[in-house]
Amino acid sequence: DLTPAQRFEMKVVSAVLPFRVNQYVIDELIDWANIPADPIFQLTFPQRGMLAPEHYARIAELLENDADKAELDAAVAEVRHALNPHPADQMQMNMPLDADGKRIDGLQHKYRETVLFFPSQGQTCHAYCTFCFRWAQFVGDKDLRIASSEARQLHDYLRDHREVTDLLVTGGDPMVMKTRHLRDYLEPLLRPEFDHIQTI
């Protein structure tokens, strides 16, 4: 059993960073006799050290004092921003533009041969890992989220960029999507016009 202190620490951290675990992990993978040292527990349950001491103290104080939702939300937003949710200006620098100069949502073209695609239907995982650097995708803030539900934009971009050989479907676990969504994104890539795409 988790102690009240451990539960509170998790509450503090999960106010800022996403927390999700599934029954299989809880029942089959965690050695509950070895908490908190169990590696799968460490991998999936929020840990106090995930936040800087000053961030932890600020959120803990608000929770202990039953701060109103608006005050807590504002503090959480400030802490998230301080955590640098999108390093290296990836929301600006790596976002490709269409022929009209408009940003194509849900794509990143960071490397010459590789395009990252963030399908909106795949922006979750069965369990969130504590080391995940894509946490901004899961916190419910659409300003932090990179996502697209436009298969056409993906296909148009790949058709126009023959230097791209690799498509990385990411953001969360794409295998949580319904098959029909995954098919809409990937099946057209089997056509000859996409023969430059070698790895998905």
Positions of predicted regions on the chain:
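Flexible, acidic/Gly-rich N-terminal and inter-domain linker regions that tether
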Residues: 1-109
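Glycine-rich, often proline-containing surface loops adjacent to acidic residues and nearby aromatics
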Residues: 111-113, 128, 163-168
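Active-site glycine-rich loop that binds ribose-phosphate moieties when present
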Residues: 43, 99, 148-156
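Conserved, mostly hydrophobic/aromatic
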Residues: 25, 129, 200
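Core AdoMet radical
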Residues: 133-150, 161-200
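Ferredoxin-like iron-sulfur electron-transfer modules
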Residues: 103-120, 141-143
